[in-house]
Amino acid sequence: MQIFVKTLTGKTITLEVEPSDTIENVKAKIQDKEGIPPDQQRLIFAGKQLEDGRTLSDYNIQKESTLHLVLRLRGGAKKRKKKSYTTPKKNKHKRKKVKLAVLKYYKVDENGKISRLRRECPSDECGAGVFMASHFDRHYCGKCCLTYCFNKPEDK
């Protein structure tokens, strides 16, 4: 019986085969006509890829049926190597939560009078509630960088 093989270029090849012929035999005949090695050939009929060990009758291929020939693609996407880090990941810094932390900014004396222990920043940029850090020789605002230095008595 006669079957047709359509290639990707659109060329149609006619082959003389028997229903008992295997797919390997058909690929060998295509190699004789086209020179394409059988290991690179993929034959498709009715949307299914034909396996080498089976016969034409297994796939119900009758006379004047058309098989589609496509070339096998080797490989695929490049396999990506998993990154391995030599040093462990650094943990993100977590701020310590201190309950009633506001109490360290104020002092209450025995009369019930409240006095500030830290100076509040007078800058318009900072606004109320921003305290200046007290260093041994200065007061410093961390938000607006305003610094007040203390006068030291000079030794003579």
Curated annotation (Swiss-Prot):
GO terms for molecular function: protein tag activity; RNA binding; structural constituent of ribosome; ubiquitin protein ligase binding; zinc ion binding. Pfam families: Ribosomal_S27, ubiquitin. The modification (Microbial infection) ADP-ribosylthreonine is found at residue 66. There is a cross-link at residues 6, 11, 27, 29, 33, 48, 63, 107, 113 (Glycyl lysine isopeptide (Lys-Gly) (interchain with G-Cter in ubiquitin)). Keywords: Acetylation, ADP-ribosylation, Cytoplasm, Isopeptide bond, Metal-binding, Nucleus, Phosphoprotein, Ribonucleoprotein, Ribosomal protein, Ubl conjugation, Zinc, Zinc-finger. SMART domains: Ribosomal_S27 (SM01402), UBQ (SM00213). It comes from the Eukaryota. GO terms for biological process: cytoplasmic translation; modification-dependent protein catabolic process; protein ubiquitination; translation. PROSITE patterns: UBIQUITIN_1, UBIQUITIN_2. Changing residue 107 to R: Abolished monoubiquitination by RNF25, leading to impaired ability to rescue stalled ribosomes. There is a cross-link at residue 76 (Glycyl lysine isopeptide (Gly-Lys) (interchain with K-? in acceptor proteins)). A zinc finger (C4-type) spans 121-144. The modification Phosphoserine is found at residue 65. In the N-terminal section; belongs to the ubiquitin family. This is Ubiquitin-ribosomal protein eS31 fusion protein.
